[in-house]
Amino acid sequence: LHGIGMGGMDALKGRYLDNGMLDFLIKEREAGRIRNLGFSYHGDIEVYDYLLSRHDEIKWDFVQIQLNYVDWKHAKETNARNTDAEYLYGELHKRGIPSIIMEPLLGGRLSKLNDNLVARLKQRRPESSVASWAFRFAGSFPDILTVLSGMTYMEHLQDNLRTYSPLEPLTDEEMDFLEDTAQLMLKYPTIPCNDCKYCMPCPYGLDIPCLLYTSPSPRDRS
């Protein structure tokens, strides 16, 4: 179920509950026509908590959440509607529900850090890419089913293969290091846009993410 949480409980009831759609999908899974039933979460935490409260009944096979080393503790500082990934993941982990991770690079922002933060990461691991830190973070927790990655070039694929084959989980000290990095990143003025394009198409024909990215106000740069 895609985009669960957008529109709140009213949207959930209208799309999946009141019309019997969720019950139908559960029966289709029982019949073997659906292998895995899950949802991707965006937005309203009331919806997230409600669906997880029914896990014993529904038995979710997976849930897709936004998780990265900034959103882990600072989600609302990047987007006011978001919830800390520490909470989202924690609620899944305690129920034994596998997680699919989206936005491990926070819309690419964690691969395009300013020069000071790049130098900070490179000083620690000169041979590793900036993006690999975020991918290692996303893969370091138990019950992670997969980590999504939007790869544009062959170099991105090769870097991901180096990161995950095999994965070297972050140490506790490296976790603290990335938390400090996140706090430093948030000190720089940014426009909270992840280039998700949910604001598109614009009724006025504007390319909103592109305009924000090229704005004189800093977004990912300092």
Spell out what each predicted region is.
Residues 204-209, 215:
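Helical "substrate-binding/catalytic lid" subdomain
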Residues 2-206, 222:
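Beta/alpha (TIM)-barrel catalytic core signal, keyed to glycine-rich beta->alpha loops juxtaposed to Asp/Glu
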Residues 213-222:
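Single conserved hydrophobic/aromatic residue that forms the stacking wall/gate
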